[in-house]
Regions:
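HAD-like aspartate-dependent phosphatase fold
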Residues: 1-168
Length: 168
């Protein structure tokens, strides 16, 4: 529906038609970076009024998946606040004490320390989960490493393959 900070041509008219015709709709994103509220505000800034209930992110899909697999799960999570909030809202405790899962999403602050901790936790038995299978992601002016690129050093160091959650 948008690229960068611009609506795609016809997007506004299409969404207005969906509302006018009382169609049910949901915007899916394989990004774990933002919360539905933030996505709502971004579209509002672009001139499109869409309720936050119409957004489903890979962070929400990951949190839902984990909460069905392991009620009261614990996780070491590397990712932005969209992921952290989704895990919290799903009742998943984020900590660094024998986590059940290591979860990797898009992260601006990704560093060697994250790789070291994630490797230790996976070697100690934590299950390795990626919020999406994207190797790169588009940004204004090019591409950036995405979830699978951030996951690669952990998979290589542990010899374990991550499970990647699909949001669609």
């Amino acid at each position: 529906i948008y690229h960068g900070n611009r609506l795609l041509p016809g997007a506004k008219e299409f969404v207005e038609w969906l509302y006018r015709e009382e169609k049910e709709f949901l915007f899916l994103t394989n990004s774990s970076r933002y919360t539905p509220k933030e996505l709502q505000k971004k579209l509002e800034w672009m001139g499109l009024d869409v309720d936050q209930s119409h957004f489903y992110t890979s962070a929400l899909a990951t949190a839902a998946f984990i909460s069905t697999q392991t009620p009261e799960a614990t996780a070491y999570a590397v990712g932005e606040h969209g992921l952290q909030n989704a895990l919290y809202d799903a009742g998943i405790t984020v900590n660094e004490i024998h986590p059940d899962y290591v979860i990797i999403g898009e992260a601006d602050n990704y560093c060697y320390d994250h790789i070291v901790k994630a490797t230790k936790f996976v070697n100690d038995g934590a299950r390795l989960i990626g919020t999406n299978y994207d190797l790169t992601g588009p940004v204004e002016g090019g591409i950036v490493p995405a979830c699978r690129a951030l996951m690669a050093p952990i998979e290589l160091a542990t010899g374990k393959q991550a499970y990647y959650v699909r949001s669609w």
